[in-house]
Amino acid sequence: MTASSRPAEYRDVRTANLNTITFDNLFDKDEAELKRLIESCEKDGFFYLDLKSAASQKFWNDLYTIDSTTKDWFKQPIEKKLQTPTVSLAHGFKAVGNQSGSIESKKDGFEALKIGKSELDGRWALPDVVSDNLPLFDQFASSCHFISKLLLDCLSDGLNLKGDARFETHHRDDCRSKSTLYFLHYPPGAQDPNKVGQNMHTDIGTLTILYAPQWGLQVFSPADGAWEYVEPRPNQIIVNVGDTLRFLSGKRFKSALHRVLPLGGIQIEDRYSISYFLRASDSTEFKDSDEDESNAKQWYTKKYAMYEMPHVIQKQQTTLSGGMAQELQATF
C-alpha cells in the first residue's frame, strides 16, 4: 500500500518496516526463507506472512465469512453478549473497559469473543454463533493451527533444535492448552473517551496469527523508542512472537511490544480484528521475565490478571510486557 492509497488521516504516519515471509516457501524448508524467518523473530518479533497463492484461497474465504459472521454477533445488545458461556479466561466474552487502556489512567476500548480450541474441539459451552456455524469455525481454527504449527516447526529447524528441545514438543495436540480464537471489536469511542484502544503489551503465548485490515495497530521501535503503525496489507496476515516462545528460545527471540491506539486517541469507526493465539501445553515449564520458574498455565493466569491492573502497578512489574518494556525502556 502506497502512502497515497492510505486513509487520509494515516497518509503521513510512520510505519514499521517489517519483513515479509512467503508461506509457500516454508513447506519444503527453503533455506533463504528459514533464515529470514529466524531473523524476523530475533529482530522484531513481528512479520507479515504472505498467503496469496491459490493454495491459501480456502483460508481467505473462511476468514472473510467468519469475519462477517462475528461482526453481526457483535451488533447484539450488550445484555445478550454478557450471557455468552464463559468458562475460563480463554473462552467466553470480554466487555469493554475491563482492562487498562492504551492511554495512561484510561480503560481499554474493545470487547472480545474468545473461543478456546479445547472447548471448540470438545463442543463445550459454545455460544450459538459457533454452534450454528460449526464447520466454519472448525475449519478456520484448524487452518490457523496448521499455519502456526508449521511456523513453529520451521523455527525449530532454523535453530537446528533436536529431540525434546524442539518447540513442537511443547505444543502437542493431545495436551490441554490455552490456544484460542479471539475476535475483537473496538466500537466508536466518542461517546466515552475514557475507554481507548488496547494497552501496550506482549502476547502471552507462543505465536499470534492476526488479521487486522484496519489501521490502529502499533509496534514499538527499539531503534529510537517510537511507536510505529503496522500497515494493513492485502493477502497478508501478521504474525508475532509471544512471551512463551521468547522464554523457550532462551530470549533469543523477541516478544513484540505492541498496542492499539487510534489517531487522536478516539476510535471514530467500528474496528475489528481476528487473532489465533497458539499457546504451549499448560504444563510447559520455563523461566519467566523475572527468571522465576513458571509454566504456561501459571504465566497465562498471572499475565491476564496484570492486564486488569492500573497502569501504576503495571509499570512496577515486568509481567505486562514479558520484560520487553524494561529491556527497551518503553513507556505508556
UniProtKB/Swiss-Prot annotation:
Its cofactor is Fe(2+). Its EC number is 1.14.-.-. This is 2-oxoglutarate-dependent dioxygenase FG08081. 2-oxoglutarate-dependent dioxygenase; part of the gene cluster that mediates the biosynthesis of butenolide, a mycotoxin that shows antibiotic activity but does not seem to play a major role in the spread of head blight in wheat. Butenolide is derived from glutamic acid via a 4-acetamido-2-butenoic acid intermediate. Induction: Highly expressed under trichothecene-producing conditions. Coiled coil: none annotated. Pathway: Mycotoxin biosynthesis. Binds 1 Fe(2+) ion per subunit. Belongs to the iron/ascorbate-dependent oxidoreductase family. Keywords: Dioxygenase, Iron, Metal-binding, Oxidoreductase. One of its GO terms (molecular function) is metal ion binding. Pfam families: 2OG-FeII_Oxy. Fe cation binds at H201, D203, H258. Gene3D superfamilies: B-lactam Antibiotic, Isopenicillin N Synthase, Chain (2.60.120.330). It is an enzyme of class 1 (oxidoreductase). Residues 176-280 form the Fe2OG dioxygenase domain. Disulfide bonds: none annotated. SUPFAM superfamilies: Clavaminate synthase-like. PROSITE patterns: FE2OG_OXY (PS51471). InterPro entries: IPNS-like_FE2OG_OXY, IPNS-like_sf, Iron_ascorbate_oxido_reductase, Oxoglu/Fe-dep_dioxygenase_dom. 2-oxoglutarate binds at R271.
